[in-house]
Regions:
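Long, low-complexity, charge-biased intrinsically disordered regions
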Residues: 1-126
Length: 126
């Protein structure tokens, strides 16, 4: 397991510029989508898979350059500037970065987003 003790300190630093609104995104599957998808799956005897990603944002690369100043927790490096390379919690663009990363992963294993709700992923059966 990786050491994420310093993650919160970087988020709390807040040394960054404003994030454009076009780079923010919060991915939420609609309640109606879940109900309809589960009903269709049940009626057609289809397999349903779901999952949760621990530390999900830190798995996604950060697509922009965000600088922070390191705190006392970093010892001799305190006060030095650093570039954040992962989509940490607290960054406005983290939701969009994670959604793009998840979309790339889902497409790479054969899933496609539903046209009605792009947070529902479907794999065509042949």
């Amino acid at each position: 397991m990786e050491d994420f003790r310093r993650k919160a300190r970087l988020v709390a630093g807040g040394h960054m510029t404003e994030t454009p609104k076009c780079m923010t995104y919060s991915s939420v599957v609609g309640q109606e989508t879940v109900r309809i998808a589960l009903t269709i799956a049940e009626l057609n005897n289809l397999q349903v898979k779901l999952g949760d990603a621990m530390n999900s944002y830190v798995t996604a690369p950060c697509s922009e350059k965000i600088w922070t100043v390191l705190g006392k927790e970093f010892g001799d490096d305190q006060g030095k500037k650093a570039i954040i390379v992962r989509a940490l919690y607290g960054l406005k663009s983290s939701g969009a970065a994670f959604h793009a990363h998840l979309a790339d992963c889902m497409r790479s294993i054969g899933y496609t987003p539903c046209r009605g709700d792009n947070d529902l992923w479907i794999m065509a059966l042949h």
